[in-house]
Amino acid sequence: MTLFSSISSISNPMTSSKSSISSFGSGTSMGSNSIACGGGCGGSGGILGLGLGLGLGLDLTGGSRSRGACGNGGNSGNGNGGMGGGNGPCCGGCCGI
């Protein structure tokens, strides 16, 4: 069972980052970069997890998409999060992977 909540029109004036859509719910992360990682981690953590995802995993580079780094067993994705350093650090901190 997965709950979906989309975040759109997220942009950074300094990097012209495109809008991102992330899925938040029962540990499933899909969408864009480290934001998706944070969303997957925050599935059971509610606002706290969501805050960590957006604050620590916010992608400032518009890099590659996450491949379910948190939700699918810990295979590190290709996110290039500027603040969080990508999916690895975010998932390591949020998910304990």
From Swiss-Prot:
Family: Belongs to the hssA/B family.
Region (Disordered): 1-29
GO biological process: sorocarp development
Protein name, per record: HssA/B-like protein 38
